[in-house]
Design a protein with these regions (language model features):
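Accessory alpha/beta interaction modules
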Residues: 1-170, 175-180, 185-187
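Short, charged alpha-helical interaction segments and adjacent helix-coil junctions
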Residues: 2-19, 23, 81-95, 202-315
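Generic detection of long, well-ordered alpha-helical segments
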Residues: 15, 31-36, 190-194, 219-226
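Generic preference for flexible, low-structure residues
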Residues: 41-45, 54, 58, 108-110, ...
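Short amphipathic C-terminal alpha-helix that caps PH/PH-like domains
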Residues: 42, 108, 112, 197-204, ...
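An acidic, glycine-/histidine-flanked metal-binding catalytic module
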Residues: 165, 172-222
Length: 315
């Protein structure tokens, strides 16, 4: 029993806690002592120089208090205010559970409007309302037709007339960013800020410290910020309580993603794919691997040996 617990609270050599784990995301980006990390991320999202936001970013409370009896409590991942010409309140949410994406999107929109209401100062007019932006780091496209890595939504009517510019929703598909980085298929497709953002978002998905450090080297940022981020990763990797919680989260997420992929396999078979077809199995293996599902779980789902799986991955 003791050995089992010891294994649960320690990472393998070279492994790291993924930043798409919401607690790790908060530790990295919702840290008032090292606000420069979050400032750098926001500068890439909003396509401005780091210096334009330096000293203007302030973390807000993650919890919204309410006196209403029975009102659902909420705690956001990161909430920040930027005072730059206007006031911008920004909610950042990270999620990798594809199965519940609609429910999660509804929750995040609720957070957005609730935050806007709680930050309206009594003496201000409604014209003076802060801008409130929601930034989702997800593993899916909202618009499945366009399939854009960076999606942007505003309140508008069916003819395209904007109802209010005070609210915006950004959806960033971090899994697609990871795939673009992994296959070295991002260069020349984006402008410099977006290219850096693709790499930053890819870094949220990696599970090896070597890969994380390699990605950071490719991103334009101050050396001291890079060192801070690398230091934060090392701290988290040696936090046994956090590692235990991360492993529980990862196991659950693997089960959810594996069940989704199994459902997709059944649908594919119904459309005429035979169970034993090599190409079909290869695609399933690669899809599960890209979703950071363990070799053991892939083996159970595909009936392939771990050696066969490694050969497919390394082809």
């Amino acid at each position: 029993m003791g050995k089992l617990l010891e294994k649960k609270n320690k990472l393998k050599e070279g492994e790291m806690i993924q930043l798409c784990y919401d607690e790790a995301f908060k530790i990295m980006f919702a840290n008032s002592k090292h606000i420069e990390i979050l400032t750098m991320l926001l500068s890439k999202i909003f396509k401005v120089d780091y210096e334009a936001l330096e000293g203007k970013v302030e973390l807000l409370s993650l919890k919204v208090s309410s006196k209403k009896i029975g009102e659902k409590k909420c705690e956001r991942d990161v909430v920040v205010s930027i005072k730059h010409d206007e006031i911008y309140n920004i909610i950042l949410e990270v999620n990798v559970k594809k199965k519940f994406y609609q429910s999660i999107m509804n929750r995040n929109l609720y957070y957005t409007f609730q935050t806007a209401g709680h930050t309206l100062i009594e003496k201000n007019t409604y014209d003076e309302m802060p801008y409130t932006f929601l930034i989702n780091f997800n593993t899916f496209f909202i618009n499945r037709t366009k399939k854009e890595v960076f999606e942007e939504f505003v309140l508008q009517d069916k003819y395209g007339m904007v109802l209010s510019d005070k609210y915006k929703v950004f959806n960033i598909n971090i899994e697609e960013c990871y795939n673009l980085w992994y296959h070295n298929n991002y260069q020349g497709k984006f402008e410099s800020y977006e290219e850096d953002l693709v790499l930053l978002c890819a870094s949220l998905m990696v599970s090896e410290e070597k890969e994380f450090n390699s990605i950071l080297k490719m991103i334009q940022m101050k050396p001291e910020i890079k060192e801070l981020m690398e230091g934060k990763i090392r701290e988290m990797n040696h936090d046994e309580k956090l590692v235990t919680e991360y492993r529980t989260w990862k196991d659950e997420n693997e089960r959810i993603n594996a069940s989704i992929i199994n459902e997709e396999r059944k649908e594919a078979r119904q459309e005429g794919l035979e169970e034993g077809r090599v190409e079909a199995k290869k695609e399933i293996v690669l899809e599960m691997y890209r979703n950071n599902i363990s070799l053991d779980m892939i083996s159970k789902c595909t009936n392939l040996s771990q050696e066969e799986i490694k050969n497919i991955i390394n082809e």
